[in-house]
């Protein structure tokens, strides 16, 4: 349904759907506020169950072509290692001295073809970065910038990690 400056989407997952226990009532709102897109999730259930809501929005700040000239910064000293099937191994690895280090703005194209095993597995970037200074409060954790368009995307969250995918 339409709400002021946005839209609210609702979904009910009935008890047993996808073999998960409990009825899960989900509400997602997308709101435009002062040049920002705010996405809020709310879910309630009547039984103990697993719920891991996420967003798979992809941005090309140029408006066309590829994203290799985008500059990305991720405020994270560590990332989660993946196996060859892109499944997390549980191992947390420092970004320092690896092509996974986006603590300072880097062009995506700089290391997208690097021989580093994590990049080779995914044919680009597709990992979770473990964010610095996690305290459960909303804070700025990443930026992407296009010199071509002059558009900068700021990402904020109250969660401990971010998945960065380069459209491999």
Regions from the language model: what does each represent?
Residues 1-168:
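An exposed, glycine/acidic-rich loop-and-rim segment of catalytic or binding clefts
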């Amino acid at each position: 349904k339409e709400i002021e400056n946005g839209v609210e989407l609702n979904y009910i997952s009935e008890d047993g759907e996808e073999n998960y226990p409990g009825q899960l009532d989900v509400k997602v709102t997308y709101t435009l506020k002062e040049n920002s897109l705010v996405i809020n999730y709310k879910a309630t259930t009547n039984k103990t169950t697993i719920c891991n809501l996420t967003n798979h929005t992809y941005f090309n700040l140029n408006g066309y072509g590829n994203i290799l000239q985008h500059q990305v910064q991720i405020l994270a000293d560590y990332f989660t290692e993946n196996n060859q099937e892109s499944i997390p191994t549980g191992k947390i690895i420092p970004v320092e001295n690896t092509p996974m280090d986006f603590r300072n703005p880097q062009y995506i194209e700089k290391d997208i073809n690097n021989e580093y095993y994590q990049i080779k597995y995914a044919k680009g970037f597709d990992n979770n970065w473990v964010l610095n200074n996690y305290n459960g409060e909303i804070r700025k954790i990443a930026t992407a910038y296009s010199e071509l368009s002059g558009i900068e995307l700021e990402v904020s969250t109250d969660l401990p990690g971010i998945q960065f995918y380069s459209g491999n």
